[in-house]
Amino acid sequence: MSYPQWPGQLRDGLAAMNLSLSDSQQQQLLAFLALLNKWNKAYNLTAVRDERVMVSRQLLDSLSILPWVTTDHLLDVGAGGGLPGIPLAIVVPEKRFTLLDSNGKKTRFLNQCVLELGLDNVEVIHGRAEDCQPDQPFTQISSRAFTALENLVTWCGGLLANDGEFLAMKGQYPDDEVAALPAGWQVESSHSLTVPGADGERHLLIVARAERHR
């Protein structure tokens, strides 16, 4: 279920992003993409079905936030098809990743990825964010194509450390979502993401409690 142009697209994209990965890491990324492409036909894991753009819109897009992933243990909420969690876990195996999703089909896919790709640094949890009870709160929580910012902080705020931050991946800058953030939350910074081969705007919003740096 792979596409002949994927290896070249990945190499070129990584070079454009100044990311140096081993051959085995690149093979893992492509194996993950093949799994996603295969399972997507039955499980509807992602809206991206054009094999020509999967490397850029799924792998490279996920890796575009890597410079902002500073925690040793990242929670990826609404993990769905494993984006950005699985690509990040492949690229930084020294960090731990917890992937949370309430859809049983999606978590079955994620568990299969962990098994087939040998990702010892990934844990998959089937459940809702509101019901999740981690041993300790997370300092960073990522979100991609999950929900509006208002819902993100409402549903997942209890999982975030007081001084933690959300890494919210968006397309166009979501002015309406930012305006609707509940009191006590703010966008600390916004970063325009450059994803080789992908059309359209991409933004990363760093969202945190307003009192974080007081």
Swiss-Prot record:
EC number from the UniProt entry: 2.1.1.170
GO cellular component assignments: cytosol
Entry-linked InterPro entries: rRNA_ssu_MeTfrase_G (IPR003682), SAM-dependent_MTases_sf (IPR029063)
Keywords: Cytoplasm, Methyltransferase, rRNA processing, S-adenosyl-L-methionine, Transferase
Enzyme class, UniProt record, top EC level: transferase
One term of GO molecular function: rRNA (guanine-N7-)-methyltransferase activity
Function text: Specifically methylates the N7 position of guanine in position 527 of 16S rRNA.
Protein name, entry field: Ribosomal RNA small subunit methyltransferase G
Organism of derivation: Marinobacter nauticus (strain ATCC 700491 / DSM 11845 / VT8) (Marinobacter aquaeolei)
